UniProtKB/Swiss-Prot annotation:
Protein name in UniProt: NAD(P)H-quinone oxidoreductase subunit J, chloroplastic
Keyword annotations of the record: Chloroplast, Membrane, NAD, NADP, Plastid, Plastoquinone, Quinone, Thylakoid, Translocase, Transport
Gene Ontology terms, MF aspect: NADH dehydrogenase (ubiquinone) activity; quinone binding
Species name: Panax ginseng (Korean ginseng)
Role description: NDH shuttles electrons from NAD(P)H:plastoquinone, via FMN and iron-sulfur (Fe-S) centers, to quinones in the photosynthetic chain and possibly in a chloroplast respiratory chain. The immediate electron acceptor for the enzyme in this species is believed to be plastoquinone. Couples the redox reaction to proton translocation, and thus conserves the redox energy in a proton gradient.
GO CC annotations, alphabetized: chloroplast thylakoid membrane
Length: 158
């Protein structure tokens, strides 16, 4: 079933794939990494002016990595704002996705966390570096194929 935004994107020749609706009825779309930045700018101009959240996850061991964006169209006088969920999948070997920092500044720390935990490189992000783990940390802790280093934490006995 095609949603309102998907129909609008098709009408304007913008390539995407409809993934249906989530349990709350929010339309979910898949966008290719190479198309993501231009479609993000178009969505912002179309009225999706608020990035509610960005997160990332490992789809399957050895499989794709996903970057997920929850966007909201906030308008004066509208009680129920329109929402959309965008999923951008990237290959594990070279997970590169264009950053949308210059479209929605609120994605700054969220893209950095996705980089830090899963190793997704957000091209054109102005400060893409580790945010939770030490700079010297090797690997991406939230990947399903991650092997934890062999060390033990010293805990206080009290």
């Amino acid at each position: 079933m095609q949603g309102r935004l998907s129909a609008w994107l098709v009408k304007h020749g913008l390539i995407h794939r409809s993934l249906g609706f989530d349990y709350q009825g929010i339309e979910t779309l898949q966008i290719k990494p190479e198309d993501w930045h231009s479609i993000a700018v178009i969505l912002y101009v179309y009225g999706y002016n608020y990035l509610r959240s960005q997160c990332a996850y490992d789809v399957a061991p050895g499989g794709l990595l996903a970057s997920v964006y929850h966007l909201t169209r906030i308008e004066y006088g509208v009680d129920q704002p329109e929402e959309v969920c965008i999923k951008v999948f990237a290959p594990r070997r070279n997970p590169r996705i264009p950053s949308v920092f210059w479209v929605w500044k609120s994605v700054d720390f969220q893209e950095r966390e996705s980089y830090d935990m899963l190793g997704i490189f957000y091209a054109t992000h102005p400060r893409l570096k580790r945010i939770l783990m030490p700079e010297s940390w090797v690997g991406w802790p939230l990947r399903k194929d991650y092997i934890a280093p062999n060390f033990y934490e010293i805990q206080d006995a009290h």
